[in-house]
Amino acid sequence: MTQSTFSFNIAFTQSVNPPDQTVVLSATELWYGIRRGGRNPHDFAPYVASCEVLSGTQNEFCRKLTLADGAVHTAAGEDLIQDVIIAPPLHVQAKTVTTGATSTFLLSHGTAAKEDNERPELFLTAMYELKLDNVKPGTQAAKDIEFNYTALARGACDNAVRDIRKWKTEGKLAAWQREAEQDGAGVSNKGEILPYKD
C-alpha cells in the first residue's frame, strides 16, 4: 500500500502602508525587498543558515539552502535544493526539487480607483505549499506541523515587511536598486520593468 503525501497550504497577507505607519514603502521599494529573498533568503528567514546559487539566470535559478534551527520539518544543517522563479515586479517563488513544496512572496496592489502616490495601497502575501512523504495525514505529527507551519508563515509575512522597511531606513534598498539597474535587472525608479540580462 502506498503512503499518501501529506500536504498543507497556508497564506498570509499584510497591508504594507497602514495609516499609522511613518516609513512608507513604494511599490518599487517593496519589490526590491521581496526580490532580495530570491538569492538571500537568510536575510528574511532565521531558519535559513546560508544560500548558494548553483546555476541559472537572474530571474530563474537553482539554489541550495542550508537550514538553521527553527525550521518546522527539517533539521539544522540539512540542505534543500530549490528552483527559483522571479517574476518582476510580482513575485519570488521557490520550489523544493525533491518534494514540490513551494513558497511564494507576492506583491499586490489595492483596488482603489486612484493610486495614492504618498501612501500607495500595497500588500505582501506569503504563500506556503508544504508537501512531505514521511508524515501521515491526520496524525498528531501532521497536526503539529500544521500548527507550527502556520506560525512560521505568519511570522514570515510580518517579518518580511518589517525587514524591508528597516532596509529602506538603512539605505540598503536604494543601494540594491542601483546595483540591479546597473546590471540591467529589475524595475526602474519610474516603476518600469527593466529587461533582464542572462
Features from the language model and the residues they span:
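Beta-strand elements of well-folded, non-transmembrane domains
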Residues: V16-P18, L67-A71, Y128-N134
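Alpha-helix termini
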Residues: P19-D20, A113-D116, G171-A175
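Beta-strand/loop substructures that line and gate deep hydrophobic ligand-binding cavities in soluble
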Residues: K95-D158, R162
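Hydrophobic ligand-binding cavity/cleft-lining segments
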Residues: M1-G56
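A conserved amphipathic terminal alpha-helix motif
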Residues: Q140-K197
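Hydrophobic residues positioned within well-ordered beta-strands of beta-sheet architectures
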Residues: I10-F12, R63, Q82, L122-L124
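Glycine-rich portal/gate segments that line the openings of hydrophobic small-molecule binding cavities
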Residues: V53-G100
